[in-house]
Structure formats: structure tokens, C-alpha cells
Amino acid sequence: PRYYLLSATSQPHFQQVFSMALGIREPWFIKSLEMVPSSKNPEKLEMRIEIDFTEGTKFQYGDSGDCYPVHDTRERTWRHLNFFQYRCYITARVPRVKLPDGKVKTVDVPWGRDGSGFTLMMEGVILSLVRHMAVSTAAREIGEHDTKIWRVLEYHVEEALKLQDFSDVNGIGVDEYSHKGHNYITVFVSHPEVVIDGEGRRRSVSKPRVLFVTQGKDKAAVERFLARFKEKKGDPDAVNVATSDMIHGFRNA
């Protein structure tokens, strides 16, 4: 069975409600919304939302702010947040534009990254889950293969690394961890900044954060961190507190 909840001829108010919920704005609009048998399990239903754009729209590409007419389109699908207990997918024709140099580029859509397979809202849920559980557990929780979860995680970690700034770090903690044998990693964290309040009590005014993680537990691990620390505007001379368990490799560093 196929249940049509909304089509181009449906009540505008119904369409507006779903557009607001999804954050869809002109020139994008919801073309159809239906419940269909799941592609993974035909005995279950899933929601399919088709989004389209107004014909004749020019789309912006790049930082210049210039807009270009649509060259062609490619159909893409993203998994969205569940609609109650039903899986929800968004499908859209994604425009490509031809630049003055002849290159054809895919424009960004407001609800998802190109090549992700998940909407930005769904990626937010994934990132929240992996903060509290293993990736394999998170994958089972949402019913996806863990390789998809790893791709989302790796992308956002790389983006976060680009924004690292160690200029305010004046305390560092070092520790090593192992998993299943002697496969060690070394973790470097910042100490929280502590101030003395008006009543003479010590109070933390910042939270500790992970600065760097690397394989091994030797002098080379510390040297790799030091290189990254300087690269991200860290000043070794400004570090007045450093703590570690003082294993041999760390003492040598």
C-alpha cells in the first residue's frame, strides 16, 4: 500500500507545517509526502518526502555571492529524523551549475551535506549518540551500518580539528590507554583554568578538553603533540602545569 499524505494539490497549510518543521524555504518546497513500504522491510512503512525547487531559480555557488542558472540536476536521498516510529527519507533534485570557467559544480542544499546520506539534523543525533556509546552500538540504535556512522564522525572531527586554537592553554595532562593488548594511545588534555574567588575558594572557570590523541606512549608521541601544539598557536613557555604518570617514555620527552 502507498498512502499519500501530501501532494502538490494538498492544502497549503499542511504543506507549510512540514516546511517549517524541516526548515524548507523558497525556492525549495515540499512536492509530495507519502508513506510507502520500507525498502529494507516491505512489511513496515516509511515516510518519503520529496523536495523540489522553483523552475527558473538561480543558485549561489562559492564565496563570491554570484548566482548561476541550473545546468542539470542529480537526485539525492538523505535519511532524516524518524517521523514518530517510522523511518523518514528526503529525496530531492540537487541542482548543478556551470561556472564561468566551464566547471560544473553541485550546489549546497540547506538540509544536508553532499555525499553524507543523512540530513544535518540526523547527523546531530548521531554525534550525540557517539558521545555516550560505542559507534557499533549507535549504529544498531538507529539501524544503520557502522561504516556510515564512522564517515559522519570522521568528517566532523576533521572540521573541528581545523578550528583548534591552543593559545589559551597553560596546563596539560598526559596519559596513555590500551585496548585489547598492548596497542597504546597517548591522550593530551588541557587542565581546567582555576581561579581563587573572593572567599578564597578555588573555582574552575573552564572545562578540560582533549587536545591531541596519537598512537604509542613514547618520546615520539610527545614530540608529535608538541608539533601540533605549536601549529595551533600553543606557547610551550606559557604552560606552567604538566601532569603525567611519568612512564619512561614521557620522562625522556
What are these regions (language model features)?
Residues 1-107:
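Short, conserved DNA-binding cores of transcription-related domains
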Residues 1-3, 63, 71-172, 176-183, ...:
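Short, positively charged, Gly/Tyr-enriched micro-motifs
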Residues 13-17, 125, 148, 221-224:
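Exposed alpha-helical structural elements
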Residues 48-50, 98, 173, 187, ...:
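Structured core elements
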Residues 54, 112, 216-220:
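A short, sequence-level motif marking secondary-structure junctions
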Residues 150-241, 248-253:
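RNase H-like nuclease fold core
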